[in-house]
């Protein structure tokens, strides 16, 4: 079974590009990362930074998660991210997404030993 840390990498890491390459980025990435297999995942964020930089956020600013848990951390610096949001015309299995590139602080939930990101909570 896929570990929570590996799932985070599959769902949220794209270190190979510095930003979304085109307006079609989300349509391609959501499909290739298996985020449209059983349904269209409504919202997803990809982070264009090194895995080490994103893992380091687990030792940065401790904040409360949206669900009230206390194991979330906010990055000290902004990061290059791409938000993928399902469009109104999207219908499974033909999931369609709007691609939005941004520079924001990320908030991730961390768990385990080593202490690594397992959930993308928000960007601010």
Swiss-Prot record:
PROSITE patterns: RNASE_PANCREATIC. Disulfide bonds join 26-84, 40-95, 58-110, 65-72. Gene3D superfamilies: Ribonuclease A-like domain. GO terms for molecular function: lyase activity; nucleic acid binding; ribonuclease A activity. Pancreas. Pfam families: RnaseA. It catalyses: an [RNA] containing cytidine + H2O = an [RNA]-3'-cytidine-3'-phosphate + a 5'-hydroxy-ribonucleotide-3'-[RNA]; an [RNA] containing uridine + H2O = an [RNA]-3'-uridine-3'-phosphate + a 5'-hydroxy-ribonucleotide-3'-[RNA]. GO terms for cellular component: extracellular region. Glycans are attached at residue 34. This is Ribonuclease pancreatic. It comes from Capra hircus (Goat). The lineage of its organism: Eukaryota, Metazoa, Chordata, Craniata, Vertebrata. The gene is RNASE1.
């Amino acid at each position: 079974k896929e570990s929570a840390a590996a799932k985070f990498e599959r769902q949220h890491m794209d270190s190979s590009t510095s930003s979304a390459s085109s307006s079609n980025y989300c349509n391609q990435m959501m499909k290739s990362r298996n985020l449209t297999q059983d349904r269209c995942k409504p919202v997803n964020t990809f982070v264009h930074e090194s895995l080490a930089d994103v893992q380091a956020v687990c030792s940065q600013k401790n904040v409360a998660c949206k669900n009230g848990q206390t194991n979330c951390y906010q990055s000290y610096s902004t990061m290059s991210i791409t938000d993928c949001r399902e469009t109104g015309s999207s219908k499974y299995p033909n999931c369609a997404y709007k691609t939005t590139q941004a520079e924001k602080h990320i908030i991730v939930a961390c768990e385990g030993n080593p202490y690594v990101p397992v959930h993308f909570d928000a960007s601010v």
